[in-house]
């Protein structure tokens, strides 16, 4: 049984719209957290395993690099650009799923860095999902982690590597 590959332009639209939905979900959940939760106050959802705790993270995962917000902003911008290039070149829907998750999470984090306090390029990430006191994250983090895991698993079990088109220009030999 063969699966029909989507047209490249349809796949690109799907990846882009999926990424934008992830951004909307992440930013909407952050709006909810900021309008509902008190800073650093814990609200259990599942005992002490999972809860809500609003914090503003100037760094990366686990608060690392908190003094290097501009560098993290540049890394996020480069990641978004690279993921857009990959999204435009991918031809496999299975690969596109992972790219969409990474792109949505990266765009949302870049938006936080650029638009949130304390200022442009130095914005703090809004985190509010507390995982048993080990770390606090957000919806974008969930998509970033699950998409990365998905792509690793896909690369291990997929028979053919993901196909990335260099460009859609005809080759020199066909002119």
Which residues does each predicted region cover?
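Alpha-helical transmembrane bundles and membrane-interface segments of multipass inner-membrane proteins
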Residues: 1-175
């Amino acid at each position: 049984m063969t699966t029909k590959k989507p047209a490249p332009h349809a796949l690109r639209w799907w990846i882009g719209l999926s990424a934008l939905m992830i951004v909307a979900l992440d930013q909407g959940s952050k709006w909810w957290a900021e309008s509902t939760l008190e800073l650093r106050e814990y609200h259990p959802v599942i005992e002490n395993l999972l809860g809500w705790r609003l914090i503003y993270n100037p760094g990366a995962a686990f608060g690392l690099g908190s003094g290097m917000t501009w560098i993290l902003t540049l890394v996020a911008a480069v990641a978004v650009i690279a993921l857009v290039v990959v999204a435009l070149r991918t031809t496999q829907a299975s690969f596109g799923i992972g790219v969409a998750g990474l792109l949505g999470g990266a765009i949302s984090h870049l938006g936080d860095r650029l638009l949130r306090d304390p200022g442009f390029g130095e914005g703090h990430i809004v985190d509010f999902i507390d995982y048993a006191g080990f770390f606090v994250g957000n919806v974008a983090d969930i998509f970033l982690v699950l998409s990365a895991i998905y792509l690793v698993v896909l690369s291990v079990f997929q028979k053919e590597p993901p196909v990335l088109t260099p460009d859609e220009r005809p080759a020199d030999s066909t002119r």
